[in-house]
Amino acid sequence: MPGSLPLNAEACWPKDVGIVALEIYFPSQYVDQAELEKYDGVDAGKYTIGLGQARMGFCTDREDINSLCLTVVQNLMERNSLSYDCIGRLEVGTETIIDKSKSVKSNLMQLFEESGNTDIEGIDTTNACYGGTAAVFNAVNWIESSSWDGRYALVVAGDIAIYATGNARPTGGVGAVALLIGPNAPLIFDRGLRGTHMQHAYDFYKPDMLSEYPIVDGKLSIQCYLSALDRCYSVYRKKIRAQWQKEGNDNDFTLNDFGFMISHSPYCKLVQKSLARMFLNDFLNDQNRDKNSIYSGLEAFGDVKLEDTYFDRDVEKAFMKASSELFNQKTKASLLVSNQNGNMYTSSVYGSLASVLAQYSPQQLAGKRIGVFSYGSGLAATLYSLKVTQDATPGSALDKVTASLCDLKSRLDSRTCVAPDVFAENMKLREDTHHLANYIPQCSIDSLFEGTWYLVRVDEKHRRTYARRPSTNDHNLGDGVGLVHSNTATEHIPSPAKKVPRLPATAAESESAVISNGEH
């Protein structure tokens, strides 16, 4: 039948396509949310309890979306002893736009110049916070297609989330995540298990090309987020049940079947509400709920309609309480980065994934299914899942990816706490200068983490030049990921279809290393 899947299609696909390595970057300073409450003159607990936020990372005028992505990509390549010639696709998901024509990806190509590798597919993808997930799906689709040449795909999700002075400002943050996608991965994408919902909505958008600030309809944004979750979860449940039925399993899928459940996190409290929302869906979908002890005390809500409950405080309170243990077991750990650094837009949900991988051992993760809900305003949303490999032995791919993130909490704790008035001054400086030509950033580079790329200048033609703060640490982790390429740091296997120049493992750049996105 035209358009149908061949019966032997899976035999043609690479095995266990998924996330091989993951790197996260956030700036070296933050503002304390409790102190920000005092500075803003709001009730104590409005940000820390009401939103669930403890700290909010931010960047000075020395960092922009290009520098964030340069930093996270080079850190990933160095930490995993990867050669730049082993990347065949590079795609960036971001909504932080500093050029309406030139992509962030094209700026990242400067890192590949010395290798001579220019045969790299992919470009930027944009739809609010969903662009990173769209880029991930494109990478997976490339590897599972006739276009794949045997090399890795690299996905970068990054953003600077800032808001005008007011109620939305404490929901900001900044960061970037790089994901290495390939076969034989420790975190495997479940094939055929994506529940997607797309819809037209003006819940959050950025129509002013001269401003970094969005226009936000807060109430509509929450409704869109939760309604998209309802629909995505419904589609996902139907698809996995169909798979199970083919295997002889006639059970309904519920939250209990996820080992972990992570979600896009504008702020932590909304993620807790989203898990309660999924629990409500399970409750309404269970034909035998009156006999299921997990739903004890919820009988009065058996006839509610999902579309009537988005702002029903009684429903919200009851199901948050009833799902609290599930939240603690499956979701709470994923909020480490969100709680400590804030919203990272496209990279938010992947920061949540990093948080889980950083806090559990390979043995605790092995064999688990991780649910992932990605949401971008406007709107685009998908709920999909990752299956963790069973191999948790020392030196395994899973062991390597968790080891690479074991310092996540210490990195968060190593940042500098900045007073709210200094934070406000930095926000005003960005507001006044982010769009300027012929501009030299005013802030010092001394406070940046080692190995951080930063903005040196913007010339009179808006061309941006960057440099990297020297790093004294050796980022390499011995053999690296060691899957598609050789385990030897000085030998790398490029695409089997194309011979490109070989490059030894990248060393930290010298202090004088400068790159530019201009054609000069």
Curated annotation (Swiss-Prot):
Family: Belongs to the thiolase-like superfamily. HMG-CoA synthase family.
Biological classification of the source: Eukaryota, Metazoa, Chordata, Craniata, Vertebrata
MF term (GO), any: protein homodimerization activity
Summary of subunit composition and partner proteins: Homodimer.
Protein name, as recorded: Hydroxymethylglutaryl-CoA synthase, cytoplasmic
Keywords linked to the UniProt accession: Acetylation, Cholesterol biosynthesis, Cholesterol metabolism, Cytoplasm, Lipid biosynthesis, Lipid metabolism, Phosphoprotein, Steroid biosynthesis, Steroid metabolism, Sterol biosynthesis, Sterol metabolism, Transferase
Free-text function comment from the UniProt entry: This enzyme condenses acetyl-CoA with acetoacetyl-CoA to form HMG-CoA, which is converted by HMG-CoA reductase (HMGCR) into mevalonate, a precursor for cholesterol synthesis.
Pathway(s) it belongs to: Metabolic intermediate biosynthesis; (R)-mevalonate biosynthesis; (R)-mevalonate from acetyl-CoA: step 2/3
Catalytic activities: acetoacetyl-CoA + acetyl-CoA + H2O = (3S)-3-hydroxy-3-methylglutaryl-CoA + CoA + H(+)
N6-acetyllysine carried by residues: 46, 273
Annotated GO biological process: acetyl-CoA metabolic process; cholesterol biosynthetic process; farnesyl diphosphate biosynthetic process, mevalonate pathway
Subcellular location(s) of the protein: Cytoplasm
Keyword Lipid metabolism annotated: yes
Gene that encodes it: HMGCS1
Main location: cytoplasm
Modification sites for Phosphoserine: 4, 495, 516
